[in-house]
């Protein structure tokens, strides 16, 4: 199967993860409203936003004679029943990590794969739980100053120094924490007829 693969994200972290599959791909920036709907659950939110990003990405690319397969992804974290997102500021990051100290946080990553040739959307939500150590204020401040995780849900980068914050990780795919669960992605691509191992050499790039 020949296809063009598109990542509907400009996140360097998601790009680095997708590169592990050794498939050429292009990136587009889906500009969508990410405001939660009233009473929307974390699972419903990330699934909806992942699908909207994939559809928005499809609208940003030129039509071609080969199928375009667009990947959308979104992530939120849930602690004590409350959705938390990206901190954006140092103070917010410190507050998030202070709340997480000694607690368990579940991350929900919505993943959507859209084939514009047949208009088929396949999506799922992948959970992953991190169990935090009891952290002192000094440790939290040191970490935030060192790694500046201001654009990461939950205020940490597990691929870096953030790994020192945890007692235990619990889930099927640690890539979920970085924003793109590769095991599930491979499964969704296969449902679109894309076999990563046997068909990767046949794919093309815009």
From Swiss-Prot:
Catalyzed reaction equations: N(7)-methyl-GTP + H2O = N(7)-methyl-GMP + diphosphate + H(+)
Keywords: Cytoplasm, Hydrolase, Nucleotide metabolism
Subcellular location, record wording: Cytoplasm
Cofactor(s) demanded: a divalent metal cation
Major enzyme class: hydrolase
InterPro entries recorded: ITPase-like_fam (IPR029001), Maf-like (IPR003697)
Catalytic residues, chain numbering: 74 (proton acceptor)
GO biological process terms held by the UniProt record: nucleotide metabolic process
Pfam family, one: Maf
Stored CDD domains: Maf
Annotated site, Important for substrate specificity, chain positions: 13, 75, 159
Enzyme Commission number: 3.6.1.-
Gene Ontology CC terms, in alphabetical order: cytoplasm
Disulfide bonds: none
Molecular-function GO term, any one: nucleoside triphosphate diphosphatase activity
Function comment: Nucleoside triphosphate pyrophosphatase that hydrolyzes 7-methyl-GTP (m(7)GTP). May have a dual role in cell division arrest and in preventing the incorporation of modified nucleotides into cellular nucleic acids.
NCBIfam families assigned: maf
Family: Belongs to the Maf family. YceF subfamily.
Protein name as catalogued: 7-methyl-GTP pyrophosphatase
